[in-house]
Amino acid sequence: MPKIKTRKAAAKRFRLTGSGKFMRRRAGHNHLLEHKTSNRKRKLAGVALVSKQDLANVRLMLPNTH
């Protein structure tokens, strides 16, 4: 039986926390920032947790994380 491979695109975008949750970046903080408020940019700069609805898909893409 072949080895299970990790989806590298997902591996670059998600990090596993110590409690078993996945962290992700927020969308909308790369460009076109001049019209966004400082408050909005500050909130977009932080990391977010993957929602429980998406968690199963992330785990399928990253099979070697525990």
Curated annotation (Swiss-Prot):
It comes from the Bacteria. GO terms for biological process: translation. The gene is rpmI. SUPFAM superfamilies: L35p-like. Belongs to the bacterial ribosomal protein bL35 family. Gene3D superfamilies: 4.10.410.60. GO terms for cellular component: cytosolic large ribosomal subunit. PANTHER family: 54S RIBOSOMAL PROTEIN BL35M, LARGE RIBOSOMAL SUBUNIT PROTEIN BL35M. Keywords: Ribonucleoprotein, Ribosomal protein. This is Large ribosomal subunit protein bL35. NCBIfam families: rpmI_bact (TIGR00001). GO terms for molecular function: structural constituent of ribosome.
